[in-house]
Amino acid sequence: MLNNFLNLELLNISLSYPFLFLITTAIVLLLCSGFWKFHRSFYIGISSLSLIVSAFLILNNANAQGLEAKAFLATLNNDIVSFYASLVILCFSFLYLLMQKEENQGEFYALFLFMIASLLLMVSSSNLVLIFIGLESSSLALYTLIAMRGSDNAISSAIKYFSIAAVGAGFFVMAVAFIYLKTGTLDLSANLALKNEFQKDPMLLGAGVMIFVLCAIKLSLAPFHFWLKDVYYAAHTNLVAFISVVPKVAMLVVVIRLFDFLNNTGFEYIIIVLAIFSMLIGAFAALSQNNIKKMFAYSSVVHSSLVLIACIPLLKEQNFDGILLAIFGYWTLFAFANYAVFMILSNYENNSYESLNGLLVKKPLIAFCLSISVLSLAGIPPFGVFWGKFMILNTVILNGYWYLALFVALSSVIMLYAYLKILIHVLFMKNDRVYNIKFSFIQNFILAFCVCVSIFAILLML
């Protein structure tokens, strides 16, 4: 074992370069910020460049070693799941950095890079210990970022998020202990040969349920979503856009690996009930909100539930590549529309619906961008999220879960009323206030790009 560990060829250290580079950059930024003060553009430039280099290293590894490479005694995987997830994480982290307007603290960007490195570690491993290390490292950094930016309630909301997630982490650790007790291994991919034992042993199935509790908390699935509304309301608006997309990508990878591990065990019935319950609770709760950010908090519950539904066929060993395309396709299209909405909302201190009154008259171009993005999130054709939802429905129906499509349609109709409330205020309500909406050239470009993706997403289907 020791000889294997010292064998550099088996270690394959190059697979760890993407997140090691981010960690090194974060340490340098942290040291620099302790001795010198730099402008925000310096921190954004260095952080953005490090993300680009990390993406290049991932692409280089995929080109040189393919998508079956392993490292550190097969605890790190360069498979198709980690490849796509890593690129999505880096892409939307890069966009988030370019959306920054005010943050000048070097510690903020150092913590941000530490978090992204932890997320990359998390999606690149099927080893439960490394997944837990990546999860907790990224979560601790995220709690701090929430507390550093936002309203006066940001600290209390971060503590609430931390407290609820700590309970989920306890379930995860106990589940890991149960799995190791029964199988003698901590690798999810190694356990795939033990499906028959899973069917017979309630302890192992219970361990899978306990792991999923933490996944549900991080994906903000009902009834594990109680932290979400407070965080959305208190955190800085641009950070909310990031929270709603990037950390959930890493958690989706854990769900994909877990479901691939638990297939043919009867676990699917638990997930089906939870997904339907979560989707409907989120949709009905969104209708009753008077604050836009809180409405989008419950909207994200619905979107997370939809992606969970796309994962369900994995529990029956169905077409893996097709399911993966539906999951990442939907989430990417959702992310672009979501970023556009929150970029516009970041200009408002008051996120009530009334604050959007008269936007069409005063800022018609901004009103157009907001309307297109909201229609996309609502799943109205021919805009982006509609095609993502189409891929999910196609996947679940082809795999025999046609009844889930009915609940998806019901939740979509309910959410349509919540989204239309925004459009009514933007397009038809009058207001004499002066809108002070300012974007830099880069931010204007990001907004235009996100809206164009929503408009021309149909081209991706060809």
Swiss-Prot record:
Superkingdom to which the source organism belongs: Bacteria
Keyword annotations from UniProtKB, A to Z: Cell inner membrane, Cell membrane, Membrane, NAD, Quinone, Translocase, Transmembrane, Transmembrane helix, Transport, Ubiquinone
A biological process term (GO) from this entry: ATP synthesis coupled electron transport
Protein name: NADH-quinone oxidoreductase subunit N
EC annotation from Swiss-Prot or TrEMBL: 7.1.1.-
Membrane-spanning parts: 15-35, 42-62, 80-100, 113-133, 161-181, 204-224, 239-259, 267-287, 295-315, 323-343, 366-386, 396-416, 441-461
Entry keyword annotation includes Lipid biosynthesis: no
Membrane-related topology note: Multi-pass membrane protein
Taxonomic classification: Bacteria, Pseudomonadati, Campylobacterota, Epsilonproteobacteria, Campylobacterales
Family, as annotated: Belongs to the complex I subunit 2 family.
Stored InterPro entries: NADH-Q_OxRdtase_suN/2 (IPR010096), ND/Mrp_TM (IPR001750)
Coiled coil residues, start to end: none
Catalytic activity: a quinone + NADH + 5 H(+)(in) = a quinol + NAD(+) + 4 H(+)(out)
Gene Ontology cellular component list: plasma membrane
UniProt enzyme class: translocase
Organism name: Campylobacter jejuni (strain RM1221)
Role played: NDH-1 shuttles electrons from NADH, via FMN and iron-sulfur (Fe-S) centers, to quinones in the respiratory chain. The immediate electron acceptor for the enzyme in this species is believed to be ubiquinone. Couples the redox reaction to proton translocation (for every two electrons transferred, four hydrogen ions are translocated across the cytoplasmic membrane), and thus conserves the redox energy in a proton gradient.
